[in-house]
């Protein structure tokens, strides 16, 4: 299974540990959830941008067709 090694400084690591503890998750599960959440948010932003471009250019596209 693919994996990812990420370097953090001590302050960052303590912040991550505290957040994982607050969510009652292991570091691995917390990091996985955070990365997947960010990836999903990116996908949603790209889809929303595409929708806005299509919406704003619909009239021009209609006239050019």
Swiss-Prot record:
It comes from the Bacteria. Keywords: Repressor, Toxin-antitoxin system, Transcription, Transcription regulation. Induction: Constitutively expressed in all growth phases, part of the MSMEG_1276-phd-doc-MSMEG_1279 operon. Negatively autoregulated by one or both of Phd-Doc. Disruption phenotype: The phd-doc operon is not essential. A triple TA mutant (missing vapB-vapC, mazE-mazF and phd-doc TA systems) survives antibiotic challenge, suggesting the TA systems are not required to generate drug-resistant cells. However the mutant is more sensitive to oxidative and heat stress, and does not survive long term starvation during aerobic growth on complex medium. There is a difference in the level of branched-chain amino acids, which may play a role in monitoring the nutritional supply and physiological state of the cell. Antitoxin component of a type II toxin-antitoxin (TA) system. Neutralizes the bacteriostatic effect of cognate toxin Doc. In M.smegmatis 3 TA systems (VapB-VapC, MazE-MazF and Phd-Doc) may be involved in monitoring the nutritional supply and physiological state of the cell, linking catabolic with anabolic reactions. This is Antitoxin Phd. It comes from Mycolicibacterium smegmatis (strain ATCC 700084 / mc(2)155) (Mycobacterium smegmatis). The gene is phd.
């Amino acid at each position: 299974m693919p994996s990812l090694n990420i370097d953090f400084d001590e302050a960052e690591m303590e912040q991550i540990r505290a957040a994982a503890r607050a969510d009652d998750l292991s570091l691995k599960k917390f990091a996985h959830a955070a990365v997947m959440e960010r990836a999903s948010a990116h996908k949603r932003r790209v889809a929303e941008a595409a929708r806005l471009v299509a919406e704003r250019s619909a009239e021009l596209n209609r006239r050019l067709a």
